[in-house]
Amino acid sequence: MNNIDNLIENLNKEQKEAVISTEGPNLIVAGAGSGKTRVLTTRLIHIINQKKAWANQILCVTFTNKAAKEMQNRVMQYIKGSANSVPWLGTFHAISVKFLRRHAEALHYKSNFTILDTDDQKKLIRNIVKGEDL
């Protein structure tokens, strides 16, 4: 039994089905601590192992930095040395920024652009209003 088989063996029935069904997308909806990240990472490793896709053809997105880091650590542990590329793993925001930076020139932006959060936006507006005596 290889490493991926061990990973799959430790899943429950529904989780195994989600991992092994490699045709088309899966939507995993479950509560906190139920194993969503484990299912996603195991499925990703299984897809690469079964040669259904190259690692860099896979996009795996999550909401939290914690889950993204966990996914990256788990996947890289199993694919290092066996894959020539790395999957796109991360939060919606991180992947979007990576994509925008890669294609910034097509949008007539520099790739070192800054994204302002709400607080920074408010500060910028205040500074402009103050500087323009509005």
Q: Residues of each region from the PLM?
A:
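P-loop NTPase Walker
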Residues: M1-K110, I115
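Conserved ATP-dependent motor core of P-loop NTPases, especially the RecA-like helicase ATPase domain
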Residues: F92, K110-L134
